[in-house]
Amino acid sequence: STLCARTGLEVLTLEMPIHQHSDQASRGQEHQNWLAANFPKTRHTQVDLTPVYDHFVAAMQPGGADHDLSLANSRARLRMSTLYYHGQANGLLVAGTGNKVEDFGVGFYTKYGDGGVDLSPIADLYKTEVFALARHLGIIESILSAQPTDGLWGDDRTDEDQLGATYPELEWAM
């Protein structure tokens, strides 16, 4: 979002909680406040997707070995639909957050979810480079020190827990 805001073009950021942990929500809000203070063409809105997701879950019949994974990925797809609604309604593009390790190294994204974007400004950067860029851009410390997580499971598992390796290990392998 900061790279998009630095273009000087209009930027709309969306907070889309789905049973989100309070620390994740507060970090997001802190970042939105920082963006608004530093980039006048940035605006923010919140769309609480929890009720929509809960209705979706209630309509699904539990079954199959991948039921929990299917529900987790449904969160990413619901967010993608919301991003594209707001993008089209406002004449804006959807920018992604995927990096070289996640999108091209190990495929750690949800097809038609967080992988469904119009542009990927950090797609060519390793995760460690993303953090270095974030430090250079003055991103708030609470985000820099947070363990990366997709927030799709409703628990405290991190990206590295799910991947079974650290980002530096994955970068070394790549």
What function would you assign to each model-found segment?
Residues 1-105:
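ATP-dependent adenylation/nucleotidyltransferase module used to activate substrates
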Residues 23-26, 78-81, 125-129, 164, ...:
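Conserved active-site and cofactor/substrate-binding residues in soluble primary-metabolism enzymes
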Residues 59-64, 159-167:
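Short, charged low-complexity intrinsically disordered segments located at boundaries
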Residues 93, 97-165:
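Catalytic subdomain that performs nucleotidyl-dependent activation
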Residues 169-174:
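Short alpha-helical "packing" element that flanks the helix-turn-helix/winged-helix DNA-binding module
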